[in-house]
């Protein structure tokens, strides 16, 4: 595969951008390909190579790249202005669309990213409960703000996951393993009346794809209600992807607050917090808990979300369900054929293959994966025209633009890659 122009651009980029990229997840050795354009299920690089894309911008592109309806509506909005600094009618319209779909949503506050949404939701929970401590799950990613960038450590006090984060900032962030009821009960009992919220990815999408065990989200809802703790479901990835009402509809669990991003902007940068009216009204200016942003509710992102909801219907979810099921079954068949005991996890249009013989149900079991061979697998797929995230701990996504032919070509590439690695 020819990547001369990408190498040339990367060599230039490292002089102007830290590591040559604007987000570390995009970096892989020896250098990433540089995109030129994308359409539907395909992304094209500056060297003219075509890839079937399962990264999809890390989740926002439910319809694939450059959806015609969203483009048309975006051009219309572009001519009307890109930032007003005052409210617009479309903000109200998109809020109503979210409220119509999401079980917990009685009010919505739009932000500029999922990071802003989770940061503000945690601040809201702390302000409402007048408590400082929060619980997150090991391996869960809730954005790049200090309170949640915490690695595994003592359940009593989190340690910063990056230089530059004071220990005092994370001392109130406690960690527990996902899907472990007893560990969470113990942690809550040890910190009675001190915990403001539990924040959870209902399907953990940043250690690959780890769904909750049956009844686990119900358990979270029950134990938070019993202890006066707010439950925040982080739906930045799952929201409007695994069902019309997100994971809370899919698993029939209604949180106090939920955070969104990615799909709710139709491919434009956005975030959102949704929840019960009595809580949401505590945000300024109706309440005292501060939350703001220059580009919050900007016309381009709001318009993109409205355009996405105009084409998102029941048939979209039926197609995504069939494609996800077909794809996972195909991978399992290949593993059986090659006698490789790896595990495939997935929920609807989210999928990941784990390079381990262990069942993966939390952070520790995900870490048993062979990340070195996964990276080799990534490069072999790339050589065969398939683009997935380069990390074992990211999730793969299917869009409504992925055809059966795309899936079959991908399964063929997967078989070739695994055969080269293990046979």
From Swiss-Prot:
GO terms for biological process: protoporphyrinogen IX biosynthetic process. Its main location: cytoplasm. Keywords: Cytoplasm, Isomerase, Porphyrin biosynthesis, Pyridoxal phosphate. Pathway: Porphyrin-containing compound metabolism; protoporphyrin-IX biosynthesis; 5-aminolevulinate from L-glutamyl-tRNA(Glu): step 2/2. It catalyses: (S)-4-amino-5-oxopentanoate = 5-aminolevulinate. GO terms for molecular function: glutamate-1-semialdehyde 2,1-aminomutase activity; pyridoxal phosphate binding; transaminase activity. SUPFAM superfamilies: PLP-dependent transferases (SSF53383). The keyword Nucleus does not apply. It is found in: Cytoplasm. Its cofactor is pyridoxal 5'-phosphate. One of its GO terms (cellular component) is cytoplasm. The modification N6-(pyridoxal phosphate)lysine is found at residue 262. This is Glutamate-1-semialdehyde 2,1-aminomutase.
């Amino acid at each position: 595969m020819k990547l001369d122009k990408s190498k040339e651009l990367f060599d230039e980029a490292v002089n102007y951008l830290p590591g040559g990229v604007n987000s570390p997840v995009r970096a892989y050795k020896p250098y990433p390909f540089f995109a030129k354009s994308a359409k539907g299920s395909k992304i094209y690089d500056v060297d003219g190579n075509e890839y079937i894309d399962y990264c999809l911008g890390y989740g926002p592109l439910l319809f694939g790249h450059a959806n015609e309806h969203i483009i048309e509506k975006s051009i219309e909005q572009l001519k009307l202005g890109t930032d007003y600094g005052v409210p617009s009618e479309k903000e109200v319209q998109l809020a109503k669309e979210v409220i119509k779909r999401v079980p917990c949503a009685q009010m919505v506050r739009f932000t500029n990213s999922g990071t802003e949404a989770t940061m503000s939701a945690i601040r809201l929970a702390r302000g409402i409960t007048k408590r400082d401590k929060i619980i997150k799950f090991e391996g869960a990613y809730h954005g790049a703000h200090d309170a949640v960038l915490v690695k595994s450590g003592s359940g009593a006090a989190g340690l910063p996951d990056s230089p530059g984060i004071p220990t005092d900032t994370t001392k109130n962030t406690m960690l527990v393993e996902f899907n472990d009821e007893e560990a969470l009960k113990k942690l809550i009992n040890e910190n009675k009346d001190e915990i403001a919220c539990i924040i959870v990815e209902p399907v953990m999408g940043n250690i690959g794809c780890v769904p909750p065990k049956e009844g686990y989200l119900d358990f979270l809802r029950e134990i938070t209600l019993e202890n006066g703790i707010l439950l925040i479901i982080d739906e930045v990835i799952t929201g409007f992807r695994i069902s019309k009402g997100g994971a809370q509809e899919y698993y029939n669990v209604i949180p106090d607050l939920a955070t969104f991003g990615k799909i709710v902007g139709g491919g434009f940068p956005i975030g959102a917090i949704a929840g019960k009216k009595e809580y949401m009204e505590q945000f300024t200016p109706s309440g005292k808990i501060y939350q703001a942003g220059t580009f919050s509710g900007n016309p381009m992102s709001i318009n993109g979300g409205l355009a996405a909801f105009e084409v998102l219907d029941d048939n979209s979810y039926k197609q995504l369900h069939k494609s996800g099921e077909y794809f996972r079954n195909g991978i399992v068949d290949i593993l059986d054929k090659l006698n490789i005991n790896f595990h495939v996890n997935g929920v609807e249009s989210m999928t990941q293959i784990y390079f381990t013989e262990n069942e993966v149900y939390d952070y520790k079991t995900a870490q048993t994966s062979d990340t070195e061979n996964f990276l080799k697998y990534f490069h072999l797929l790339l050589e065969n025209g398939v683009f997935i995230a380069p990390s074992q701990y990211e999730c793969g996504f299917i869009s409504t633009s992925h055809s059966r032919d795309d899936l079959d070509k991908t399964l063929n590439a997967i078989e070739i890659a695994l055969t080269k690695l293990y046979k």
